[in-house]
Amino acid sequence: MVIEVVRIGQRLVRDDRVTTHVALVSRAFGAERIFMTEINPEIKDTLGKINDTWGGNFEIEFIDSWKPIVKKKKEEGFKIVHLSMYGEKINDAQEEIRKEENLLIVVGAEKVPREIYELADFNVGVGSQPHSEISALAILLDRIQGGQQFEKEFPNAKRKIIPTKTGKNVQVKETRD
């Protein structure tokens, strides 16, 4: 399954941290790429450093507008999943979404244009109360992958966490500069 995420907009200042966390969750929970509009370029640098240290090749692509990428992905056969607290319950939609091969998940920051609701193949709600888009994305990604994203290996990692019941164990790969 190919999973990509598009982040629509950003509320100035307050959202740099939230948008960074949307990208981090996307990466850690199995997405291959995130498309972002109106973003502080430092976020791309941060994610580049994460890839360099922790491995993987997660991509960030800056876009001028969400609409062309959503339409293009739809034409390529991607199913569009819009995260919205107004959508159908995730418990009711997750099985059908799991069957899809390619997904583009839309995560809004500001008021989402009505057109997104119409373009989406799935409008999915993680609870019907106000909540964080970060938590909604994490829950959706976990539900549709059934926890398998946690088995993913991140190639070329300089550091790797070794799960342990107590303490912490980080394997550090020696590098020569």
From Swiss-Prot:
Top-rank taxon: Archaea
Catalyzed chemical reaction(s): cytidine(56) in tRNA + S-adenosyl-L-methionine = 2'-O-methylcytidine(56) in tRNA + S-adenosyl-L-homocysteine + H(+)
Principal place of residence: cytoplasm
Pfam families documented for this protein: Trm56
Keyword Electron transport carried by entry: no
Localization terms from the record: Cytoplasm
Biological process (GO), any one: tRNA nucleoside ribose methylation
Any GO MF annotation of the entry: tRNA (cytidine(56)-2'-O)-methyltransferase activity
Transmembrane segments: none
UniProt keyword terms in alphabetical order: Cytoplasm, Methyltransferase, S-adenosyl-L-methionine, Transferase, tRNA processing
Signal peptide start-end: none
Binding site for S-adenosyl-L-methionine: L83, G108, A109, E110, K111, V112
Assigned GO CC terms: cytoplasm
EC number(s) stated in the UniProt entry for this protein: 2.1.1.206
InterPro entries: Alpha/beta_knot_MTases (IPR029028), tRNA_m1G_MTases_N (IPR029026), tRNA_mtfrase_aTrm56 (IPR002845)
SUPFAM superfamilies: alpha/beta knot
Family to which this protein belongs: Belongs to the aTrm56 family.
Role, per record: Specifically catalyzes the AdoMet-dependent 2'-O-ribose methylation of cytidine at position 56 in tRNAs.
Subunit composition and interactions: Homodimer.
Protein name per Swiss-Prot or TrEMBL: tRNA (cytidine(56)-2'-O)-methyltransferase
Biological source species: Nitrosopumilus maritimus (strain SCM1)
UniProt lineage: Archaea, Nitrososphaerota, Nitrososphaeria, Nitrosopumilales, Nitrosopumilaceae
